[in-house]
């Protein structure tokens, strides 16, 4: 990956595409963390742990949270351990990209989000297609590397690289939590 980035450095235009994360302008989007999908995901317990940390932080700071579910009749609902009796806007979809779902697009337009933290599964399918579509709409997309996953490491790594080269902001769960909190108080 280092060799690739040396040959293909991000442009200044992409590097300047970063905004301060303000609570009212930021959405945490949890993509397809469903019963029948999660068991085959590499390091799935760490992924769930990190998503739950993001949820806890967003709940504490009143950052909105939304959930997508890919074909829930076939793949099951979002993991109960993710929801923990909380109710979040949920968008059921058959499309891989959340951006193809009119209800989701209406939701992000209604709240005028500028920043979307995208986490969940699978990196090379729904995370990738959703994020690229949202980037095309001018949104700032942040990808916590340790809160996305796929069944295969090569798919996960390649999707993450493609996302960054497409203009998404690379991050980690802890980094995003600290950026949202802005202080140790």
Predicted regions mapped to residue ranges:
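A short alpha/beta connector and helix-capping loop motif
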Residues: 24-26, 41-67, 72
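N-terminal nucleotide-binding beta1-loop-alpha1 segment
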Residues: 27-33
């Amino acid at each position: 990956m280092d060799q690739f980035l040396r040959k293909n450095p991000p442009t200044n235009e992409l590097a300047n595409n970063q905004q301060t994360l303000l609570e009212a302008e930021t959405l945490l989007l949890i993509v397809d963390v469903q019963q029948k999908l999660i068991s085959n995901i590499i390091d799935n317990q760490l992924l769930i742990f990190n998503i739950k940390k993001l949820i806890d932080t967003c709940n504490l700071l009143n950052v909105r949270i939304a959930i997508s579910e890919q074909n829930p009749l076939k793949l099951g609902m979002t993991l109960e351990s993710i929801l923990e009796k909380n109710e979040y806007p949920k968008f059921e979809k058959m499309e891989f990209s959340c951006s193809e779902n009119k209800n989701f697009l209406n939701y992000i337009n209604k709240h005028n989000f500028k920043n979307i933290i995208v986490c969940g599964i699978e990196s090379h399918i729904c995370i990738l297609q959703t994020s690229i579509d949202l980037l095309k709409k001018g949104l700032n997309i942040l990808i916590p590397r340790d809160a996305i996953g796929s069944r295969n490491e090569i798919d996960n790594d390649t999707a993450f690289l493609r996302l960054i080269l497409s203009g998404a902001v690379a991050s980690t769960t802890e980094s995003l939590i600290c950026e949202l909190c802005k202080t140790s108080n």
